[in-house]
Amino acid sequence: MNIDESKLKDDSIDTKHGCILYIENVTVSFDGFKALNDLNLYIDDGELRCIIGPNGAGKTTMMDVVTGKTRPDEGTVYFGQSLDLTQMTEYEIAHAGIGRKFQKPTVFKNHTVYENLELALHTNKDIWTSLFKKLSPEQKDTIEDTLSAIGLIEQRFVRAGLLAHGQTQWLEIGMLLVQDPRLLLIDEPVAGMTHQET
């Protein structure tokens, strides 16, 4: 499917009716087991929503559907008024402004905390841009603000593989924040964290 690239820009998401995410009548089955059964969920632009339930309730599956990792058997999923997420690839969905943190942190372990944020920040991922482009003052400020927000200023030059589990969780959240997504999905963000890390 060909997606109009202009629709993938954050500022073009049509939320005039308030909702940024529409999930309607979504069903997902795995070998006869219904992980989601006729799910309806509406999230307004700027709204904070927590989905709580036991293991196996379908929370991760719902996020998989929104991010294109899993296709629903039935139902519709829209980002804003016009982007049908069921017809888009994972890349297109991420590029449209939906960020996701998985249960298990995925960071570049051999790079520093700062380098992880820098890699996440760049929108153009071609090899030459990644190797030779210098950060603008605004991008440096974004990284510094994010380091402060996630509590990793002192660890900025520490390799990510040496961080404690909770710090790694925060780093991955920071990697999403520097991308400035319009919708952020975070799966079990405090799993394995100590009281001090949360």
Features from the language model and the residues they span:
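Glycine-rich phosphate-binding loops of nucleotide-dependent enzymes
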Residues: 2-198
